[in-house]
Amino acid sequence: LWLPVIFFVVSNPKLILLKRVVFFQSWSNRPHGSSYFNKNIQFRRNSFVIVKASGSRTSKKQVEITYNPEEKFNKLADEVDREAGLSRLTLFSPCKINVFLRITSKRDDGYHDLASLFHVISLGDKIKFSLSPSKSKDRLSTNVAGVPLDERNLIIKALNLYRKKTGTDNYFWIHLDKKVPTGAGLGGGSSNAATTLWAANQFSGCVATEKELQEWSGEIGSDIPFFFSHGAAYCTGRGEVVQDIPSPIPFDIPMVLIKPQQACSTAEVYKRFQLDLSSKVDPLSLLEKISTSGISQDVCVNDLEPPAFEVLPSLKRLKQRVIAAGRGQYDAVFMSGSGSTIVGVGSPDPPQFVYDDEEYKDVFLSEASFITRPANEWYVEPVSGSTIGDQPEFSTSFDMS
């Protein structure tokens, strides 16, 4: 996308040597998204073009210079690069599943207490952070439609929280490459927030401890503190009380995630939840059994399944069909969080009916595995992790002007 050409008056008819700079912008080489540029143009700097001004000495000639408005952002980013020790950072933002989820009581504040084994898995988003010269606003872009890009997004909330807690004044260009579906019970937004807090702390020279980041994060979301564990945790309270544990599950156990196009409203699921009809099994006994005997159908209890199946009856049918069609290939089939993702642990392959039935032509499918992270490092995407099939891509972003 080029602006109208700029004309200069030239009175010297001699050969004139002009610098022609053609800028192509993409997320791989500059900190802000610009998917609307022609991707066939190559990135060339300082290439020269010779222009002749013909005619009489006294005639005035016009010389055409190609100009791209993105040049000003290139210069700003280069200036930031020179002045800052860390100016760009790309991080993996993995999601989680609830291997079991017990709702243990209703609190006076209207929330419910839970007890759950949270575990990070290999499906995740990528978030690219770049320092912005702005001192007043973050700029967020993403590759999918329907994701809010303003203060409703947990990424922006996390940056505002970090600045409030630390007094730092860094603002960012952020691009979210989204692969985790929304409304899935996988904690994708919570992971984005935790990843953002960790990134902001890196840019500020780690002025906060991870423990502080974890405590602060509970102010903007109950599931966010979990991601500051090492990847496996027994979580209680609203989910913000995190007990880091060694992973009780071998990392080589595969799984498949199946999410229908319809999402479950978490608020509606909890509204329909009836405590007196929920499971009475001791959650610590579930954790102990998983640690000693591994995952099985009887330990993957989710008290939110009955109300979620009321909200979305087709989800119950999907779970039943996966169990029946699996014929023992899955160690357990269960819903994660408040839905609407059905998880089949034990095989990376979905049952054939998901491909054959018209009803499931729009489902999200992904294989995944359990992962953790080393101390003082963030999560790293495994090379083998993949999403089954092509997912539709869109592009939206803030105006960079």
From Swiss-Prot:
Domain of life: Eukaryota
SUPFAM superfamilies: GHMP Kinase, C-terminal domain, Ribosomal protein S5 domain 2-like
Metabolic or biological pathway, per its Swiss-Prot or TrEMBL entry: Isoprenoid biosynthesis; isopentenyl diphosphate biosynthesis via DXP pathway; isopentenyl diphosphate from 1-deoxy-D-xylulose 5-phosphate: step 3/6
GO biological process, one term: terpenoid biosynthetic process
Xref: Pfam families: GHMP_kinases_C, GHMP_kinases_N
EC number: 2.7.1.148
Positions that bind ATP: P181, T182, G183, A184, G185, L186, G187, G188, G189, S190, S191
One of the record's GO molecular function terms: 4-(cytidine 5'-diphospho)-2-C-methyl-D-erythritol kinase activity
Organelle targeting sequence: 1-88
Cofactor binding notes: Divalent metal ions. Preferably magnesium.
Regions that span the bilayer: none
Primary localisation category: plastid
Keywords of this entry: ATP-binding, Chloroplast, Chromoplast, Isoprene biosynthesis, Kinase, Nucleotide-binding, Plastid, Transferase, Transit peptide
CC cofactor: Mg(2+)
Catalytic activity as recorded in UniProt: 4-CDP-2-C-methyl-D-erythritol + ATP = 4-CDP-2-C-methyl-D-erythritol 2-phosphate + ADP + H(+)
InterPro entries (UniProt xref): GHMP_kinase_C_dom (IPR013750), GHMP_kinase_C_sf (IPR036554), GHMP_kinase_N_dom (IPR006204), IspE (IPR004424), Ribosomal_Su5_D2-typ_SF (IPR020568), Ribsml_uS5_D2-typ_fold_subgr (IPR014721)
HAMAP family noted in UniProt: IspE
Function: Catalyzes the phosphorylation of the position 2 hydroxy group of 4-diphosphocytidyl-2C-methyl-D-erythritol.
Family recorded in the similarity comment: Belongs to the GHMP kinase family. IspE subfamily.
Name the UniProt record assigns to this protein: 4-diphosphocytidyl-2-C-methyl-D-erythritol kinase, chloroplastic/chromoplastic
Organism: Solanum lycopersicum (Tomato)
Record lineage: Eukaryota, Viridiplantae, Streptophyta, Embryophyta, Tracheophyta
Gene assigned in the entry: ISPE
